[in-house]
A protein has these predicted regions:
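Activity-critical C-terminal alpha-helical subdomain
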Residues: 98, 347-383
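Short beta-alpha connecting loops at secondary-structure transitions
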Residues: 27-30, 310, 344-352
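Conserved, mostly hydrophobic/aromatic
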Residues: 124, 303, 369
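Short, acidic (Asp/Glu-rich) active-site segment that either coordinates a divalent metal cofactor
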Residues: 1-5, 12-16, 125-133, 206-216, ...
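C-terminal substrate-recognition/cap domain of FAD-linked oxidoreductases
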Residues: 137-138, 144, 149-152, 157-321, ...
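FAD-binding subdomain of flavoenzyme oxidoreductases
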Residues: 21-174, 374
């Protein structure tokens, strides 16, 4: 998404897809050790036999080594966290060929520098991740899902802030704006009100998911939410969430033949409404079609800028929207990227976001990879 794998200067691309063995499953300790080429779906298929699952879900069936290298996230990060919170340890091949192990199987440690988190999200610039030790979780006894439309964006976001503050353990909470809802209605033959809409998912016991759903229904009613449709039946849950699952393809269908440029800023959740509103004004003034989806529980949202890549004017307009959005998010105390990473695409914003600490990152890169052979030109520019 940000040019992570593009060989800007040529080079050797390492394919780890054949390193796809699940090496250890430890049900009692709720951890596993896998090779880098194991995919998320492959792991969860095996874990299900033990009544377990790995929750981080970026959408695609990504490899776990790739998810570690990019610091991947997903729709259920609001409850289970991102890859950073779920990695216990790594095996990494360093630029000089040395093999190192970081972390371990203990759930906490105050020993030494946290090299595991340093490699997580490094995008291959510090070493090659070959094995990953992960936390896993017990499969929930029950699920429920719900959908609710709001008169205003502010009401939708404020309801989520209240839900989180009240301690309701929501597993997923996703936001679609009016443009995106209109798109999924047309694409998936649905009939949702074309208003800011929240999609919820709850995990737990049969009793607890009902309690969570009822608690959320009470809270959203206080913030101008419409009817809260929810169900504990799997088929009905799938129907309720179809709009969110189809969002990308529905968005692309708004302008057939064009390309989609996804943005990825993340801001403090109390600034989310303001950031989205200012961004929508910017988009409307340019005339670009750009549906919005968001992981509203952690302040991360995505525009899908629909542009003709053969048009220099349209590309310049899209670039301007993205540039202003990133700077707006950073000014609000947020980040240029909540989950897509830096690659080469977000390099121009690193100094603005990190200030003096950018030089420390540069020194880390040079200490680990003095010859700059590991994915050069990504994450940090060392000149």
């Amino acid at each position: 998404l940000e040019g992570h794998v593009a060989a800007l200067h040529g080079g050797v691309c390492i394919n780890l897809s054949m390193m796809n063995e699940i090496l250890e499953i430890n049900p009692g300790d709720l951890d596993v050790r896998v090779q880098a080429g194991v995919t998320r779906k492959q792991l969860n298929a095996e874990l299900a036999r033990h009544g377990l699952f790995f929750p981080v879900d970026p959408g695609a069936d990504a490899t776990l080594g790739g998810m570690a290298a990019t610091g991947a996230s997903g729709t259920n990060a609001v409850r289970y966290g991102t890859m950073r919170e779920n990695i216990l340890g790594l095996t990494v091949v360093m630029p000089n060929g040395e093999i190192v192990q970081t972390g371990g199987r203990a759930r906490k440690s105050s020993s030494g520098y946290d090299l595991t988190r340093l490699f997580c999200g490094s995008e291959g610039t510090l070493g090659v991740i070959t094995e990953v030790q992960l936390k896993v979780y017990g499969l929930p006894e029950a699920h429920s899902a719900g959908v609710c439309a709001f008169k205003t964006l502010e009401g939708a976001v404020d309801s989520v802030i209240s839900i989180i503050q009240m301690g309701v353990p929501v597993a997923r909470v996703e936001f679609l704006d009016e443009v995106q809802v209109r798109a999924v209605n047309a694409y998936s033959k649905l009939s949702y009100a074309e208003l800011p809409t929240l999609f919820f998912e709850f995990h737990g016991t049969e009793a607890s998911v009902i309690e969570q759903s009822e608690s959320v229904a009470e809270i959203i009613a206080e913030y101008g939410g419409g009817e809260f449709l929810w169900s504990t039946k799997q088929e009905e849950q799938n129907q309720l969430w179809q709009a969110r699952h189809d969002a990308y393809y529905a968005g692309m269908a708004l302008r057939p033949g064009c390309s989609g440029w996804p943005t990825d800023v993340c801001v403090p959740i109390t600034r989310l409404t303001e950031c989205i509103q200012l961004t929508r004004i910017d988009v409307e003034e340019t005339g670009v079609i750009a549906p919005i989806v968001g992981h509203v529980g952690d302040g991360n949202f995505h525009l899908l800028l629909l542009v003709d890549t053969d048009s220099p004017d349209e590309m310049a307009t899209a670039k301007g929207i993205n540039d202003r959005l990133v700077k707006r998010a950073i000014e609000m105390g947020g980040t240029s990227t909540g989950e897509h990473g830096i690659g080469s695409g977000k390099l121009p914003y690193m100094a603005l976001e990190h200030g003096g600490s950018l030089e420390l990152m540069r020194q880390v890169k040079l200490a680990f990879d003095p010859k700059n052979i590991m994915n050069p030109g990504k994450v940090i520019d060392i000149g």
